[in-house]
Swiss-Prot record:
Enzyme Commission number(s) from the entry: 6.3.4.5
Matching NCBIfam families: argG, PRK00509.1
Pfam families: Arginosuc_syn_C, Arginosuc_synth
Family: Belongs to the argininosuccinate synthase family. Type 1 subfamily.
Listed pathway(s): Amino-acid biosynthesis; L-arginine biosynthesis; L-arginine from L-ornithine and carbamoyl phosphate: step 2/3
Organism this protein belongs to: Streptococcus agalactiae serotype Ia (strain ATCC 27591 / A909 / CDC SS700)
Gene: argG
Chief location: cytoplasm
Official protein name in the record: Argininosuccinate synthase
């Protein structure tokens, strides 16, 4: 009788490479690597998995699906965990889990393995998502079970013919996709240490950024960015292009001490140039086009959605319901913003929309004013009536 098939979420790094060598004793390991826009050498990763002992190796290009079905709902909801973090890693985990489950069904695998440790958020995100999609699948986490130190991993790797990554002495732990780059560990673990320039990978230092501002126009249709400077492109290409444009101006650097799902605080360095520009630009079109009641209520749901995504509940009915509400609000979010990029700052300096609720004739203080100021007297009387009655009844 043959071995059981196992799907491994494979990154090409030391942890998951060692996992192949360890797991192949008991399983037929099928390595699956998802391209979410991190810019890795995917051909090398594919071949490396086979060299170590995987029976099959797959590279899945999911950039477009990731952008359309995971990043876009987060953008439209201005999803920022603790009002600071655009959920870079948290957004990619659900689609990775989804593809792992699909590959398990396609290949007849009964088990899924991931390379997360026992103290991070991602173990929860993967396992909760997999359970939501197929509760019958078994999930194992070799790195969490081993509790090995890096030196022990290296010893095992050398003894079992696992190639040692060239950047193994890099003190940082980095995760990247098209929505941004996350960095932790090393000197960053002390929150008093300023992040050194070497900790950044996709943004220039604002001090070294160009001395001249750059202006770009971003066009939205139904809340989705569709063009930069009138050049239409797919959402994934637009985000990747904007990462380069805004990154060279030092935009999107975030230094955040966050509350992890597992109960500890963690200091993270994020680089999210495209995300920060798009979030600012999208909000400005909403400010033009949404009625006041939606503008005031939507942020409440945005905060809740940010927490749900961060806390591993992408496939929760609550998440689905909030995303549906947000999608309904986006029907009128059409227009163009002009964004000034300059030394770490992305400032929206102009905006227009065919659905704009801004009426210059109502807002102006010039002779063109069409606002009926005489109506203010009755409005104030009725608006303030509850306050007036309360004051009369409860004097002092």
């Amino acid at each position: 009788m043959g071995k059981e098939k196992l799907i491994l979420a494979y990154s090409g790094g030391l942890d998951t490479s060692v996992a192949i060598a360890w797991l192949k004793k008991d399983y037929d390991v099928i390595a699956v690597c998802m391209d979410v826009g991190e810019g890795k050498d995917l051909d090398f990763i594919h071949d490396k998995a086979l060299t170590i002992g995987a029976i099959e190796s797959y590279i899945l290009d999911v950039k477009d699906e990731f952008a359309e079905h995971f990043v876009l709902p987060a953008l439209q909801a201005h999803a920022m965990y603790e009002q600071k973090y655009p959920l870079v890693s948290a957004l990619s985990r659900p689609i990775i889990a989804q593809k792992l489950v699909e590959m398990a069904h396609q290949t007849g695998a009964t088990t899924i393995a991931h390379g997360c440790t026992g103290k991070g958020n991602d173990q929860v995100r993967f396992e909760v998502a997999i359970a939501a999609l197929d509760p019958e699948l078994k999930v194992i986490a070799p790195v969490r079970e081993w509790k090995w130190h890096r030196e022990e991993e290296i010893t095992f790797a050398k003894a079992n013919g696992v190639p040692i990554p060239a950047d193994l002495d890099n003190p940082y732990s980095i995760d990247q996709n098209l929505w941004g780059r996350a960095n932790e560990c090393g000197v960053l673990e002390n929150p008093w240490n300023q992040a050194p320039e070497e900790a950044f990978g996709i943004t220039k230092s604002p001090e070294e950024a160009p001395d001249c501002a750059e202006y770009i126009d971003i066009t939205f249709q139904n809340g989705k960015p569709i063009a930069i400077n009138n050049q239409e492109m797919t959402l994934s290409d637009l985000i990747l292009s904007l990462n380069e444009i805004a990154g060279k101006h030092g935009i999107g650097r975030i230094d955040h001490v966050e509350n992890r799902l597992v109960g500890i605080k963690s200091r993270e360095i994020y680089e999210c140039p495209a995300a920060m520009v798009l979030l600012a630009a999208h909000k400005e079109i909403e400010d033009l086009t949404l009625v006041r009641e939606v503008s005031h209520f939507k942020p409440i749901l945005e905060n809740e959605l940010s927490n749900l995504i961060y806390n591993a509940l992408w496939f929760s009915p609550a998440t689905k319901a909030i995303i549906a509400y947000v999608k309904e609000t986006q029907k009128v979010v059409n227009g163009t913003t002009k964004v000034k990029l300059y030394k770490g700052s992305a400032q929206v300096v102009a905006r227009h929309s065919s659905n704009s609720l801004y009426d210059e004739n109502l807002a102006t203080y010039t002779a063109a004013d069409s606002f009926d100021q005489d109506a203010a007297v009755g409005f104030i009387k009725l608006w303030g009536l509850p306050t007036q009655v309360n004051a009369q009844v409860n004097k002092g």
